[in-house]
């Protein structure tokens, strides 16, 4: 049972906003019958370029969510943003059968993405982006594919070093 549920919590100490991507009820079959528990997938971010995802499992949904948030805090990555509103360059990535294409966009475009990809960009702080999910639409695989794409992205400094140029030349030519 996949439920895309939006709940935005901001914690005072770290200022992370968190969104629930999916809640699943899973069953373990034992001799006496079935034992039900819950699996929760959460994405958290500071809306300034840091984002993380985590899965939590427990008998209660609230406890599973707490575990997922703690796992997401341990799994945070930094994404370099252009003008604090969009991605620096286009990127493609794949995880299992899910493929994602993430493209930077002009000012005023908004977040053109569906499902769990939109939630990730909301907590990341991106305002203008175009994203496409191809293949499997399983929320877990799509989230992991987006994170694989983020890990493939290069900062302007890395691009400048690869091209043996100055950072200013890279940023001006956009």
Curated annotation (Swiss-Prot):
GO process terms (BP): translation
Keyword tags: Ribonucleoprotein, Ribosomal protein, RNA-binding, rRNA-binding
Show where the S5 DRBM domain sits.
16-79
| A single GO cellular-component term on record | small ribosomal subunit
Q: What is known of its domains?
A: The N-terminal domain interacts with the head of the 30S subunit; the C-terminal domain interacts with the body and contacts protein S4. The interaction surface between S4 and S5 is involved in control of translational fidelity.
The job of this chain, per UniProt, is described as:
With S4 and S12 plays an important role in translational accuracy. Located at the back of the 30S subunit body where it stabilizes the conformation of the head with respect to the body.
Q: Which family does it belong to?
A: Belongs to the universal ribosomal protein uS5 family.
Listed HAMAP family? Ribosomal_uS5_B (MF_01307_B)
Per UniProt, subunit arrangement is: Part of the 30S ribosomal subunit. Contacts proteins S4 and S8.
Could you tell me what this protein is called?
Small ribosomal subunit protein uS5
Lineage here is: Bacteria, Pseudomonadati, Pseudomonadota, Alphaproteobacteria, Rickettsiales
